[in-house]
Amino acid sequence: MLKKVVAVFSSVFLIMGCGNKNANNNTENQSMDQVEKSDTEMYMLVGTYTSGESKGIYVYKLDTVTGTSKYISEVKVDNPSYLVLDPSEKFVYSVTEDDGVETSAANAFSFDKQDGKLTFINKQLTGGGAPCYINIDSEGKHVVTANYSGGSLTYFSVNEKGGLETASQVISFAGKGADTERQKQSHIHCVQFTPDGKFLFANDLGTDKIHKFNVNESGDNFLSVGNPAAFTVKGGSGPRHLKFHPNNKFAYVITELSGDVIAFDYNDGNLKEIQTIKADTVNAKGSGDIGITPNGKFLYASNRLKNDGLAIFSINEADGKLTKVGYRTTGVHPRNFAITPNGKLLLVACRDNDVIQVFKIDENTGLLEDTGHDIKLDMPVCVKFASIE
């Protein structure tokens, strides 16, 4: 996220209780009430910014081998810049990213996997401005948002109907970083449950820390401060997103400001840095997202503002270290991307030229080939997949 904020927090504290560009030559409207299922097709859900022509979340049917797609449906919601599906894929949760505390929210939807339609359930305020990331635990009972301008994270429990209860924890953070323009205060940009579900990590772009929390299934607070309370990365880095390797032994962080990928050994809630390698070689200070192929062989990191594209790395599965193998230019401002579960395609949401690009992944080299099956949509910023029933 690229915003300037001026508030500075001096302490860490816990507060309790507290239109549509959807088609081009490769994307056609799907008018059937019932979506036909094939072995290679999945739903693709896309979050957008809604200051222009987009209205909310869009659903497509994507062939995960050819890269062709069909528009299915949409649901109106303000600025759903990040989405997550629950483990059953019957419910979808999004942020409403807005700077105002009174309008920043988390939203719940039911998802009919037979007709590909989303139905709004409810929303709850996050209590922190500009929520830009949302995640859910492996049981589908607990939702957490990362609030960028609020310098906080928010916890919600999920009820039996898939709706969100009122926020029961808002955790705010202290400090600032070395970059006097971009790190004037805490900026939480990602919340990630560990593979075993015992901990939650929160990347703080503003203070160069990865905060650690214990996950408590019982007791008053779902989240409690971990030991250590945080892991610190190099000053001025701006840790943005974190992903775990499929073998659960390694974690990788993309840093927005320094343009690095940091590799960590992961063990029982602890991170040990093993490598830092450049993703952005032109000092654009706009690195965005990070992703790993399902087979664990390749890692991708997106860069924005200059030389927009994806840095491509191979992964040594023995020690977790990365080797750069290529770079693929993309459309303008690749804020987010997603790899299909079969590992064959990588789709890039290019916010500033209103397109989702569809690339084929070379299974041997990790390099990307443009399929030409672009999906035109105003300001796409998040891509997720779900199976078709």
Per-segment meaning from a language model:
Residues 50-53, 97-102, 149-152, 207-209, ...:
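Short glycine/acidic-enriched loop and turn motifs that connect beta-strands
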Residues 71-140:
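Blade-loop segments of beta-propeller domains
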Residues 70-75, 119-125, 169, 175-182, ...:
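A short beta-strand motif characteristic of beta-propeller blades
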Residues 16-17:
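C-terminal motif of bacterial Sec signal peptides marking the signal peptidase cleavage site
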